[in-house]
Amino acid sequence: MVRVDIETIVMAAGPVPSLIVLRERCGKSDSTAPLRSLSIQTGSFEAAAISRGIDSGRAECPITHDLLLDTVDALGAKLERIEIVRAEPPVFYATVVVLADGSEHRIDARPSDAIALAVRSNAPMFVEDDIMNRLGTVSAHAEEVDDEQEFEKFDEFVHTLSPDDF
């Protein structure tokens, strides 16, 4: 398994899917190795739920992801981690791993829901090695890329997209 963090969320509207871009964490053994990123398509509401979990934490009135985490907590369990376990592009499959009474429980989930839960609970996120090897793209370290260049590259990329690309 490869440990990942959210690199960015690209919000879209209408029929165009949003993207969640996960980037592998820098390995301790070789910090100069290029990092890989994995893009997962999702709906705009799902992307907004993840973004809301990152940006503002809990809503005044709990939304579904908050409610589920409150339930897990009330039962004395803990969201241990989430895993992206299978991919049949453009569809990805995830597992939420919950620790309760000393036992691990693996629950099937959509990646967007699993990620939304992870960001709210600070649970680590992982991607199967095979998925990252097949579908990950090599990217430069974020620190080495000038922000202006990054925005220009992204702008160029966005202008080349059409709805048929998704």
Predicted features and spans:
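Divalent-cation
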Residues: 1-166
